[in-house]
């Protein structure tokens, strides 16, 4: 398991390792499982940059079912597949190889952003376990191993060591390391942290960027916005009654606590979706747009990278600042459009670039070369997405401190999100440091 900070070269390190193992004959092939954008834009492109890996032959196991099958049967060194197709992969390998007693075309597997396998009860983890014993070499890559606490580790190590260190049962894992506090809450035992660190330390290599080449400072600036009294009254009514009538006459209703949380966050951002799952939204206020405008004015033309939470946020930002010809990187679906967008940013021809953190984290590099200002128009609950997005600018090659503006509505769930992210970061940093110390004491 490789826990390497963003920007430390996980891709080329892994490519070099697998090229060596292919050359020695230990591996006959490797399949890499990664987010779809990374599959399309990262691994092949990185391999051709280096003398020791440019010879590797890749097969893209994407597209329709027939296209994936043909790609899987095509002789290659490295096969690339996205997480969403893991179930299909397990079924197809069983049909074409396992049941016919044929060797798989690969005996090595790499999990790029293995944190996506953190939940051991998901179908993708269950599907892989059916073929897990067919692999002689497994590597997991991530920069955010425990963004939501130690429970995230069970599924990740299950697909790496088949349950040798943390067990095969999620229920048994929780019983062993957590105690119940009330009907729904669980907290770790006092020795949980130390025990887990010792169990996983022998196969976990941690490397922090700041240990080798210090990253620039991240200066977090929380911009807290006060709601006017009339807007505050509406927000409080929504939180209290799970119901609100908008100025347009449209009714907004939340049927459970999770839905209410989402509605409150939409309200804070300035637009709401009256009907869940429908694309139509209604404006509520422009307070965050005004705050973003102030940030852009202060930047005086320096490129600003802005994270949004909802499609309504993106549309309103693009409309408000259309005179800047902004780029929504999330909408750059092809390699050509992504390349053009990155070129505009790197040449100083883009004052505002926006994107959803889920599509902006993995596989986007180069933004640090011409920008140092981040804005969170709306936060999320995922530390992984939060740190990955920030790392687009705060990474190797950045020469100045990075400014991270977080636009927060005062006394709303915006602040709860900020506090939750800060708390999770403390837990993960402690885990990474402890694993590093464990390996040092072992002389690894």
Regions found by a protein language model. Give the residues of each.
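Conserved helicase ATPase motor motifs in RecA-like P-loop NTPase domains
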Residues: 6, 135-150
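SF2 helicase motor core recognition
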Residues: 87-90, 148-150, 313-318, 338-342, ...
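Conserved Helicase C-terminal RecA-like lobe
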Residues: 6-9, 13-35, 214-239, 243, ...
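Conserved helix/coil segment N-terminal to the catalytic DExD/H
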Residues: 65-78, 83-105
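Conserved helix-turn-beta segment of the N-terminal RecA-like "Helicase ATP-binding" lobe
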Residues: 38-63, 160-163
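Inter-lobe coupling linker of SF2 helicases/translocases
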Residues: 80-86, 98-99, 118, 122-136, ...
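Conserved helicase motor
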Residues: 37, 59-68, 83-88, 118-122, ...
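A conserved SF2-helicase RecA2
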Residues: 381-444
């Amino acid at each position: 398991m490789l826990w390497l900070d963003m920007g430390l070269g996980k891709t080329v390190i892994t490519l070099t390792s697998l090229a060596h193992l292919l050359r020695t004959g230990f591996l006959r092939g490797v399949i890499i499982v990664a987010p779809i954008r990374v599959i399309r834009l990262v691994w092949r492109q990185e391999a051709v940059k280096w003398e020791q890996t440019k010879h590797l032959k890749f097969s893209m196991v994407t597209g329709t079912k027939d296209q994936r099958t043909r790609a899987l049967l095509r002789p290659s060194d490295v096969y690339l597949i996205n997480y969403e197709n893991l179930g299909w992969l397990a079924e197809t390998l069983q049909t074409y190889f396992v049941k016919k007693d044929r060797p798989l075309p690969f005996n090595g597997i790499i999990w790029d952003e293995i944190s996506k396998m953190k939940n051991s009860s998901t179908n993708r983890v269950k599907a892989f376990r059916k073929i897990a014993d067919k692999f002689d070499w497994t590597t997991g890559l991530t920069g955010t191993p425990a963004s939501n606490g130690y429970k995230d580790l069970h599924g990740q190590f299950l697909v790496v060591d088949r349950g040798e260190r943390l067990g095969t049962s999620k229920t048994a894992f929780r019983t062993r390391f957590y105690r119940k506090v009330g009907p729904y809450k669980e907290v770790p035992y006092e020795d949980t942290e130390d025990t887990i660190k010792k169990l996983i330390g022998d196969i976990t290599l941690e490397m922090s960027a700041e240990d080798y080449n210090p990253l620039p400072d991240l200066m977090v600036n929380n911009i807290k916005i006060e709601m006017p009294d009339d807007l505050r009254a509406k927000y409080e009514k929504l939180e209290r009654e799970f119901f609100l009538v908008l100025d347009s006459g449209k009714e907004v209703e939340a049927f459970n606590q999770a839905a209410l949380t989402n509605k409150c966050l939409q309200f804070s951002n300035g637009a709401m979706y009256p009907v869940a799952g429908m694309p139509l939204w209604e404006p509520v206020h422009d307070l965050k747009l005004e705050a973003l405008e102030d940030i852009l004015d202060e930047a005086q033309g320096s490129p600003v990278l802005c994270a949004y939470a909802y499609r309504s946020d993106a549309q309103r930002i693009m409309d408000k600042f259309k005179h800047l010809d902004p780029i929504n990187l999330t909408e750059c679906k092809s390699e050509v459009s992504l390349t053009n967008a990155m070129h505009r940013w790197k040449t100083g021809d883009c004052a505002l670039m926006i994107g959803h953190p889920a599509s902006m984290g993995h596989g986007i590099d180069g933004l640090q070369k011409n920008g140092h200002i981040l804005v969170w128009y709306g936060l999320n609950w995922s530390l992984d997405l939060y740190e990955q997005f920030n790392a687009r600018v705060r990474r190797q090659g950045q020469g100045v401190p990075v400014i991270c503006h977080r636009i927060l509505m005062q006394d709303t769930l915006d602040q709860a999100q900020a506090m939750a992210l800060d708390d999770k970061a403390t837990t993960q940093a402690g885990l990474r440091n402890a694993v590093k110390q464990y390996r040092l004491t072992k002389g690894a």
